[in-house]
Amino acid sequence: MAIKKSELYSSLWASCDELRGSMDASQYKDYVLVMLFIKYISDRYAGQPFAPIKIPAGSTFQDMVALKNTPNIGEDINKKIIGPIAEANKLSDMPDFAHPDKLGSGADMVKKLTNLIAIFENPSLNFGGNRAEGDDILGDAYEFLMRHFATESGKSKGQFYTPAEVSRVMAKIIGINSQNSTSETSVYDPTCGSGSLLLKVADEAEKLISVFGQENDTTTAGLARMNMILHNNPTAVVKHGNTLSNPLFRDDSGRIKTFDFVVANPPFSFKSWSNGVNIPEEQQESGRFYGYGVPPAKNGDYAFLLHIVKSLRRNGKAAVILPHGVLFRGNAEAEIRQNLIRKGIVKGIIGLPANLFYGTGIPACLILLDKENAESRKGVFMMDAGKGFAKDGNKNRLREQDIHKIVDVFNKQIEVPKFSRMVSLTEIAEKEFNLNIPRYIDSTESEDIQNIEAHLQGDIPNADLEALQHYWTVYPTLKNHLFEKSKRPDFSRLKIAQEDIKQNIFSHPEFVTYSNKVNAVFTAWKNKNTAICKAIGADTKPKAFIHTLSKDLLDAFSNLQLIDKYDVYQHLMTYWMETMQDDCYLLVSDGWKVGNAVEWAKKEFEGRLIPKGLLIHRYFETEQKALEQLEANRDALAAQLEELEEEHSGEEGFFGSLDKVNKATVNAELKTVTADLKADKTNAELLEKKKVLEQYLKLSEEQAEANRKVKETKAGLDKKLQDKYPSLTEAEIKTLVVEDKWIATIENTVKNEMQRISQRLTQRIKELAERYETTLTELLQEVNHWEEKVKKHLEKMGY
């Protein structure tokens, strides 16, 4: 039976992290990813005579498994596994598996490498059918590990990885797709790191295209080569060297080679960029700086950008991550920026949230370059996407809704207030070619201004009510239902009591109509997609499946006011990532029969796909209510016992002399009291104590009986559940999973979103009503009243 993907990756990381010991994560990643590489090519290509990757005899992952627990395991991995594969495929810079400083020596090394190999023996890590089934185990596992390695590597060593969310945005807005690409289409990254950006662009093409990358770090370049093979791009060309001083991709005439698409996340503000660069030569007609200007000596941002411009074909397009400073810094950079804009090469600028990238917290932007129709370009499309993100540990991450919104708005060139607009070249020229986004897009939230007149004389300013116009558009008569004109112009008065605001809003006919409309939209989406969900089978591609569902949900909520379609979309995608994704992959792997399976942990069990609660709700609600009643009775008895014990504890209490209060000690005490009463039958205190002790014992007996009934009833319900799971039909499983689990959860999040929207209106009206409810005159009168009372009290006290 397949393991859930989330469980697989989490356990994979936990095992790796445990084995790392004192080694830096940026180093340990090299060993883990080489192991992943060997496992992948062995599963994928071993025994295939015409495979794109050559695996010499005796160098497969199974040959590595045979080396476990052998004294020379490190040397043998180098000589028998890594060395032959590297030589056969012209790979270099592979990590040393016999390095004593990193892996220990003697028995310590043997244990560490044996355990590392064992991690990848997990049968669920089988890459034989990877991608062909639409289940990219390798790609997802790789992303998971790389993100964790980058997080653990710290500020100076995490730059080998561009966050997947940013890579996805770049790939989707650069302009490549399955229709406009062929095997000859080329994509290039001059600072490719581990190659994640290149791979995301290649994925958008949905076919094998020509991939090229250059990386200055030796080890990272080797990692990028492996990454290309791991992601089914074995023909990709990755070269090692300094892109600025020694660009290795050149045409037959020796000039900089050009490409259809370029993506890059170069090192920010690289100070020593000019080392080895022949600046006078680069200023010549064939040089990279010709017609633009020379970047400043201690800042390489524009050096990389101009290299990218030079690397673009006549109709080439690029997406580059650079720090915000490139948009507004002066002197040499201002000259270059002006020339780029005048030539029409800059197509768009997107401001990103701060702290997205590993290795730096500097705010960054995406610069979109496009040589196609550059001479006729009239403006630059600008976007401030800096506020859309979620916290993820000590970093920020783009959410699914942020990615989708950025891509939608940019590709369709939609102008959204406080978010995006097309800025004419004329306006940019008027602002001296300064591209600082706040100069063109004011994304600041409107200030909540306090109205002095309202504080002095009461009532609510009409300006505050007009700020809620998006609500009044949907509920046109609600405003007059809640407010009436004040005696003063420009002010209104609340017609109802503050405590009745929520009830009046939620029961208003227009609110009810809108709620019904939202429900109808969701119901239409549900009716359309329930059958699609129930049709999941072995040939289903989970990523295409969720794309269909999520796109349809976005489309469904596109024409509704108040509710943000991207918020609704995010709810679906969050549920997909937390639960639905695992369910879908299980169904693709094992079929709907996985709904019959249960998992045991100690003495408790749970459905592998269908939680017990869903089965109970649909089939055993009567039994569950009976159990809940018994549990309530048991809890009530426990509360009575606790209350009785608390009442009679303490030194003077009837239980005060007991070390512990339980059935045995109370029984013994009752015998003593009964004996004492034989000698003093009318002792009121003894009689009362006997009564309390007997009450305690009676409640204890009742509690024991209640516990027995709860245990017995729960066991009976568990037995029915255990019998029900294997007897569920496929149709019943589909109903439970799709309707009761997935659709019901998504529907609930949509309803909660509707509640939040309405609650914001309620809270705002309450806030305004409370703010101006008491005038300054009334406040001063109240202050004077209490001041006089205090004075009188002080006078009585002689002060």
Language-model regions: role of each:
Residues 1-178, 239, 243-248, 351-354, ...:
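Non-catalytic, mostly N-terminal accessory regions of nucleic-acid modification and defense proteins
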Residues 18, 123, 144, 148, ...:
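Conserved, well-folded catalytic cores of nucleic-acid-processing
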Residues 106, 131, 213-217, 261, ...:
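Hydrophobic alpha-helical scaffolding
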Residues 366-407:
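Conserved P-loop NTPase
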Residues 156-264, 268-280, 286-291, 302-303, ...:
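Conserved S-adenosyl-L-methionine
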Residues 283, 295-298, 725:
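Catalytic core segments in nucleotide and nucleic-acid processing enzymes
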Residues 229, 233, 267, 310-313, ...:
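Hydrophobic alpha-helix feature that most strongly marks membrane-spanning transmembrane helices
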Residues 11-14, 18, 24-37, 238, ...:
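Conserved Class I SAM-dependent methyltransferase catalytic core
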